[in-house]
Amino acid sequence: MAESVPIPEPPGYPLIGNLGEFTSNPLSDLNRLADTYGPIFRLRLGAKAPIFVSSNSLINEVCDEKRFKKTLKSVLSQVREGVHDGLFTAFEDEPNWGKAHRILVPAFGPLSIRGMFPEMHDIATQLCMKFARHGPRTPIDTSDNFTRLALDTLALCAMDFRFYSYYKEELHPFIEAMGDFLTESGNRNRRPPFAPNFLYRAANEKFYGDIALMKSVADEVVAARKASPSDRKDLLAAMLNGVDPQTGEKLSDENITNQLITFLIAGHETTSGTLSFAMYQLLKNPEAYSKVQKEVDEVVGRGPVLVEHLTKLPYISAVLRETLRLNSPITAFGLEAIDDTFLGGKYLVKKGEIVTALLSRGHVDPVVYGNDADKFIPERMLDDEFARLNKEYPNCWKPFGNGKRACIGRPFAWQESLLAMVVLFQNFNFTMTDPNYALEIKQTLTIKPDHFYINATLRHGMTPTELEHVLAGNGATSSSTHNIKAAANLDAKAGSGKPMAIFYGSNSGTCEALANRLASDAPSHGFSATTVGPLDQAKQNLPEDRPVVIVTASYEGQPPSNAAHFIKWMEDLDGNDMEKVSYAVFACGHHDWVETFHRIPKLVDSTLEKRGGTRLVPMGSADAATSDMFSDFEAWEDIVLWPGLKEKYKISDEESGGQKGLLVEVSTPRKTSLRQDVEEALVVAEKTLTKSGPAKKHIEIQLPSAMTYKAGDYLAILPLNPKSTVARVFRRFSLAWDSFLKIQSEGPTTLPTNVAISAFDVFSAYVELSQPATKRNILALAEATEDKDTIQELERLAGDAYQAEISPKRVSVLDLLEKFPAVALPISSYLAMLPPMRVRQYSISSSPFADPSKLTLTYSLLDAPSLSGQGRHVGVATNFLSHLTAGDKLHVSVRASSEAFHLPSDAEKTPIICVAAGTGLAPLRGFIQERAAMLAAGRTLAPALLFFGCRNPEIDDLYAEEFERWEKMGAVDVRRAYSRATDKSEGCKYVQDRVYHDRADVFKVWDQGAKVFICGSREIGKAVEDVCVRLAIEKAQQNGRDVTEEMARAWFERSRNERFATDVFD
């Protein structure tokens, strides 16, 4: 007998064992445990001690039906309370399992499934018509709508029963009962065995009430069929009339009820989840999205979808397979050992012990899928490659379960999913309602995206009525109306001027704010912004009957998240596709990204012209490194854009109305107002990390229950303006502290309108008070006074003095109002000048491996004398954070960092080199904390070097004790550079000096395949890049090769995001 090795397991507590490992996100918890403890681990859950396997090699072993069989000892024992001996929850030796299996398998044969196509198409068209009639501005809850699709399709095709889900606002009560039943099944499975039953009296009553409701619906379906018999050959007919060829028996009425509930649950939950995840993945991956739409257009065209088309869609099939690999709605399945056996040749599993195959990790095994296993790449699932993977790595793709207990309805679900994908992408363009949406998971026994909303815009300029004819097979609408009608599809409420469309590409909100500013300015120049929206909304829908203005930025050379689909579509254009489009482009960027500065706006500008578009005015641009974005934009508006548009479209001075600003009423009733674009979190703890000098602080935050993150991600904070700054506004405009404002606006605004809202709320939460004044702002101040000296000085500041005295010193409108008391600016005009409050992103400085429900931030407090000479310059977000204490609440959202800025998936093989200074240490602390958790769980890791720069070990050596502890564990080797104590850091003053000093060690781990992470200010990023280039030259010389600096820098750029990942900030 082989020698047994203990199965790794986390430390537990008496009685409850490892129950404390679980939060409200059990899937995330299990993934974390697998990442921490490796491919096999055990949990102690009261009297249970299940084993979990997460690598392909071990999952392949437990899929051997000679050694393991399906278990009902897990959560399925609770599900069985509701469906008893239905196919999914029956024991294999129960007579009804074999009987039902033999009777029902023929009902899912190829010809039967093919015959269900017309009814599947019926329900799919109902979904399309709902999307079309709600219009492009209505957010669509994907999980809700695909749940309706899957439930109605299954009920109609399998049982000839209609739930009419698309004709009701609320979902059928069966859905809520089913969801609650499955959730409570999971909860019951995790109950401590010693907990008395009376604690769960209400939950138990609800549980059995839900079961009763589901049974009543199933009985209703059966009764309807019995009342109106038919010769349909569907699933229900097979249940009612089928005879088991082996026993000669029929299914009992009770078993039919159990089977119906089983199919209604399993048949729609998984399909709706798959389609929702597929939509998410495609919207996150524009290239794959484009290929799906191209395949639909080439195979199906504009006509009706036929069943014959579904076998000619290899790429969409690959998309569904890849979706099921990364986001399988069934995340795991349980088995039990038939006899004593060894896994991996060394881990003893005793007869009857439960082993759970964790697909959420097995499906991303880098041994099978490579180091990009976490990425959505449908090409790896095309037929030939899919077959190769499954041959070389058996059981590497198991979303439909295992062996004879695998999903019986797989052919049904596959045809339904293919059809839904085709009709949707044939007729609509989709965008995320929130382009920064980070995937949230809703988990019962299956998973699906939570709070995932999309917008659907009809393609080809169709109206809903025309779509209805197309879906009915009555012919496609003419494409000649494409862009003119598209403009109508996108129209907002139009004003009285010449219509124009404005689109933006924006991650941080700056370009969106500029676009809204442009829309507000339009009426005063004779135009009306009928459309203001993200660039993705303009995909295949660029208007031809009005000027189009595009405001966009680049992010490391890539398009903003809400412009990626537009850019991919635009790059695929041919010939003179844009010959009827008249456009103008404004570019935002930062010149420190030399290689990619303004890349995306330049690409838009040149490509539209190349494809026949008419450039209305020269492209405008702003460089955040040297000037103020808002000032540059307003200058382009006033000097270039509006004069050019007015000349092109013959707008007279009479048609140019006055500025449509804000109308503000002041009142004093007390009322609260909330902001809802982020979620509420709770401060757990905070502390100051430095002993003197510039303060660096640490804050620990309890996340909302559905929010998850990875080490290296960002936390977006919606701050409040400092009370001292808000007080200055109140003094300047003589507002009482309990004043309320009622704001009315004829143009787009992010301010709350038509309701009375606290003035304090408005100025603290909705607007930026410290944004530098623009030239237009300053000239508006000059118009609001009759004092000649004030006018003269303000006009000087708006002229040549602006670049020296306003922009670099960040002089705000409020600063100028205080400096020039003779300016009588109305509060409405002041509010109209202010940009909307934006979120600030901070690198998370912890790992979920430490505690998935909490995270930490590490930041520098900005509070210094103002460069303008008026008071102090107080950082909005850092001041906000610094005043929070335990128990305070704040609004946050997790934002994923670039894919490159995460730990390697093969931590055992790939070393890391981390370089940071000051609070740039934040994400790297998260990395090392994660490595420490892995080591504590018994994992073996590749080396890690951390180079860290600060001032003095006695003052600002951040987290020194933690890193000392982690060094002793072997999680990291720390090399420091003290700028004011070089005698304690090998004579090295700055972090780049220490990297060069220790170059022999750097070369050693680099040759082992190390990945380099750099985090800090732009100056640090540039200095470390320089030393890396220097090291590359020296390394080449050691190997006998001559490499110039230019060649070395080119190599560094090629390696960026592959072996070098940077995260720099201002």
Swiss-Prot record:
Stimulated NADPH--cytochrome reductase activity in the presence of substrate. Inhibited by fatty acid substrates longer than 13 carbons and the degree of inhibition increases with increasing chain length. This is Bifunctional cytochrome P450/NADPH--P450 reductase. Its main location: membrane. Its cofactor is FAD; FMN; heme. In the N-terminal section; belongs to the cytochrome P450 family. The gene is CYP505. Residues 676-904 form the FAD-binding FR-type domain. Residues 1-480 are annotated as: Cytochrome P450. FMN binds at S506, N507, S508, G509, T510, C511, S554, Y555, E556, G557, C588, T596. Its EC number is 1.14.14.1, 1.6.2.4. The keyword Cytoplasm does not apply. It comes from Fusarium oxysporum (Fusarium vascular wilt). Functions as a fatty acid monooxygenase. Catalyzes hydroxylation of fatty acids at omega-1, omega-2 and omega-3 positions. Shows activity toward fatty acids with a chain length of 9-18 carbons with optimum chain lengths of 12-14 carbons (lauric, tridecylic and myristic acids). Can also use shorter saturated fatty acids with a chain length of 9 or 10 carbons as substrates. Also displays a NADPH-dependent reductase activity in the C-terminal domain, which allows electron transfer from NADPH to the heme iron of the cytochrome P450 N-terminal domain. It is a peripheral membrane protein. The keyword Transcription does not apply. Keywords: Electron transport, FAD, Flavoprotein, FMN, Heme, Iron, Membrane, Metal-binding, Monooxygenase, Multifunctional enzyme, NADP, Oxidoreductase, Transport. It comes from the Eukaryota. PROSITE patterns: CYTOCHROME_P450, FAD_FR, FLAVODOXIN_LIKE. It is an enzyme of class 1 (oxidoreductase). GO terms for molecular function: aromatase activity; flavin adenine dinucleotide binding; FMN binding; heme binding; iron ion binding; NADPH-hemoprotein reductase activity. Binds 1 FAD. It catalyses: an organic molecule + reduced [NADPH--hemoprotein reductase] + O2 = an alcohol + oxidized [NADPH--hemoprotein reductase] + H2O + H(+); 2 oxidized [cytochrome P450] + NADPH = 2 reduced [cytochrome P450] + NADP(+) + H(+). It is found in: Membrane. The record marks T270 as: Important for catalytic activity. Coiled coil: none annotated.
